[in-house]
């Protein structure tokens, strides 16, 4: 049984980009879908769509590469894990990699980037970082 769908999804994206695959197939959850919407909005993935196979849902992610064939994602790292949760208050959320990276935070107002959480004045659980 799989306990952490976010870590599994990030690992599948990381492995697919290292193998230079066009797509990655993830298990569906609302948090994974919200995380992917942020990654798509920030330009780290081309697009994603939810597909149903029988009674199960999956997310098909189209990965993005630069003109030299390198993945746009340099590092995709899970911060808060089931064994060690990491929370940051609204004043503690800082820029990541001098503004070149993105922090994805799960707040009481939904999953959003660190910049959006700071502007909204909310803190929360730091799900992952990407740059």
Curated annotation (Swiss-Prot):
Gene Ontology molecular functions: rRNA binding; structural constituent of ribosome
Key word Repressor present: no
Pfam family, one: Ribosomal_S8
GO CC terms of this entry: ribonucleoprotein complex; ribosome
Disulfide bonds: none
GO BP annotations, alphabetical order: translation
Protein name: Small ribosomal subunit protein uS8
Species, as recorded: Campylobacter concisus (strain 13826)
Name of the gene encoding the protein in the UniProt record: rpsH
């Amino acid at each position: 049984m799989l306990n952490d769908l976010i870590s599994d999804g990030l690992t599948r994206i990381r492995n697919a980009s290292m193998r230079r695959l066009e797509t990655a197939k993830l298990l569906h959850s609302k948090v994974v879908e919200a995380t992917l919407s942020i990654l798509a909005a920030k330009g780290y993935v081309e697009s994603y769509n939810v597909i149903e196979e029988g009674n199960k849902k999956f997310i098909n992610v189209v990965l993005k590469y630069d003109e030299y064939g390198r993945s746009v994602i340099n590092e995709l790292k899970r911060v808060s894990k089931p064994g060690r949760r990491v929370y940051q208050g609204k004043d503690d959320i800082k820029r990541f990699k001098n503004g070149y990276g993105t922090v994805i935070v799960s707040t009481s107002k939904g999953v959003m980037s660190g910049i959006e959480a700071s502007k909204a004045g909310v803190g929360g659980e730091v799900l992952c970082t990407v740059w």
